[in-house]
């Protein structure tokens, strides 16, 4: 039975992959409609539960009248069927209604709907541009995806569980009281007006506070995660006081807004408690007066009193649930600000798969400024022939890494074109483009998975023998087989820690090189690929890289010029423009910027291949 209900929602179902709606109602509807049969069933369950609750109180009133009017000898004989029916309602129907409710909420909606939302929002956010992630905390993004899904589910279930249940219960109570005497409905009707007015006054204010509080919580989470993620820098600069202050500032703002919210809650609770007391007193007074006028029975008085007390008890539950609803709505709105943003870098509607037959790279009149008014790259054109090995040289900020980012379409050019084998990278799918490029960067980030998972990331279907061979060529196999983690995993199954923190910089770089060697893409980009290696290991790995370069188009970036001196051609960039181009020897003979950079590097040496 449990498995049946747990499998009703397919978390990984095909879904709308467009931008989530920016409106609150639209955002809720996008995900609630995918679970609407179960939410509708929950409403039916709530309807039956509320009617059963009211019928039990009405039955109590009938018992009081029966006990007053019937002798003990004839009670069961005349009314036994009524007692049997109510026994079935209380012992069978009521538990079944509760079971149906719990199965729907706990087995179907809670896990299924929540993880469906998380899966779909995660997939959408994962396809955002690098700029999106550069402008926010990773911890804040993750927190909003995880928390907003749970909050959307909770607020939806709370509306059905509390507001729908109480609406049916109150309407049924008014009908029962009106059946006895219309004047018995007056206290309850007046209480409903006061209660709704109280909620109307306080709940919107609490909602605004909840939205602010959700933002404060996300900022606090982001700052704490940022400190933990960069713990090495925090320890290195020995300035824990600054980190304390950074977190204290966010925590203080969160505390202040939390206190402002709780003040409103306390005032609302006072108003509701006062109106509850007035309801019980007024209902009792009207019922007793009607009884003194022989206009109602003792059973009807018992029903009226029972309903009044039950409603006042439920009012506190509804009040706290309403607060929870808007607290959750605030969290959903905070999540929407992160999730429901348009994807700024998407495949064209008619995008084709990139095919690389030769590997020619062409930049045609490219202009790009990272959204600024000027600088970086203006009207840049050059061609890298198929199989040519080109080194990009220049001071920091000259535009070297920007060219690589444009080639990989991490950003779109503002004008001009970037082509691979005559195909505009803006007109092919991003996945097919990046599958054709192998890249090693100086900032080597590894996934918090096993060594094997990281090496296989570029070619998941590769056999284990090929993976180990790639590690050996990257001079990584020797240290990998000696690794172990705290869970007893060893060698290639060892977890590397967040961003590969358990490995040294050189070890991370060798794993990254092994990953590219295994991927074996036709275009190779090396951005300071050996910057974290010592000279001996670097020289050995260079041999593997040179063999990998055979038959491939290569772009290499390095500040240590000796590592790229053997390239077929060097392009020297200055402020986004090409100022020199030629071989290593030609540029030295020219005596320009490259020659000056070469002379400035202390301990520089000519690679044997460049001599």
Where are the regions a protein language model picked out?
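Membrane-integrated ABC transporters
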Residues: 1-53, 68-87, 101-109, 123, ...
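Juxtamembrane helix-loop junctions of ABC transporter transmembrane domains
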Residues: 10-21, 52-61, 65, 90-138, ...
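Alpha-helical segments in transporter systems
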Residues: 26, 37-62, 83, 87, ...
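Transmembrane helices of ABC transporter permease
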Residues: 34, 38-51, 158-213, 282-300, ...
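ABC-type nucleotide-binding domain
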Residues: 354-611
